[in-house]
């Protein structure tokens, strides 16, 4: 049930606001005769409201991809600093194997890579993004992702819903500080 509905037009923008028992909603749309600034604003809003999906084949770092065998990942990356295997726990079962390199972690469940994480600028994504790159390069490469902010860190998430997988880029200021590629275990 809508408790309040307001429509107003300011500077060529129509703003509809609705407040209901379900929460708050706002719709911003241009009115007839809008100027170029309004067109740019609308395209930015549309882009950020519809995060870009990412193809599963693009989910990887330095040639290591989700779903590949842990042995193949080890061959590509060389001998790890640490190689640990632990039980997966009651919820998922199986075994979790973690390969640790210099600022790079690869985790596998039952022999298949499900997580790759790095803070090392030497390791790039399949599309060429690395730690230290700026947000403009990220947006040019991947478009806009789903965005969340926690403290000083902004997380841009690009999902592949068909395989319940994603690429997460953590930015501090305008620079990538961490890259995470992962898939849901089930």
Residue ranges and their predicted role:
Residues 117-118:
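Short, basic/glycine-rich phosphate-binding loops at helix/coil junctions
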Residues 8-9, 38, 49, 99:
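N-terminal compositionally biased, intrinsically disordered segments and leader/signal-like regions
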Residues 127:
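Glycine-rich loop/hinge motif
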Residues 1-27:
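Sec-dependent N-terminal signal peptides
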Residues 20-42:
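Signal peptide processing junction and immediate N-terminal pro/mature segment
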Residues 28-31, 43-45, 50, 54, ...:
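A cross-family detector of function-defining hotspots
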């Amino acid at each position: 049930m809508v408790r309040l509905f307001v429509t107003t037009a300011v500077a060529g923008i129509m703003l509809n606001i609705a407040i209901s028992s379900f929460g708050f909603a706002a719709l911003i749309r241009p009115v007839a005769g809008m100027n170029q600034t309004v067109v740019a604003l609308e395209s930015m809003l549309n882009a950020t409201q519809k995060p870009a999906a990412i193809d599963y084949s693009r989910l990887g770092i330095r040639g290591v991809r989700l779903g590949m065998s842990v042995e193949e990942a080890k061959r590509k990356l060389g001998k790890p600093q640490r190689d640990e295997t632990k039980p997966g726990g009651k919820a998922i079962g199986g075994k979790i194997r973690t390969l640790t390199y210099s600022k790079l972690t690869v985790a596998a469940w039952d022999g298949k890579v499900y997580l790759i994480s790095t803070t090392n600028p030497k390791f790039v994504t399949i599309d060429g993004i690395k730690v230290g790159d700026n947000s403009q390069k990220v947006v040019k490469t991947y478009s806009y992702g789903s965005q969340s902010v926690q403290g000083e860190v902004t997380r841009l998430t690009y999902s592949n819903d068909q395989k319940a997988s994603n690429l997460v880029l953590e930015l501090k200021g305008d620079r990538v500080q961490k890259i995470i590629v992962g898939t849901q275990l089930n």
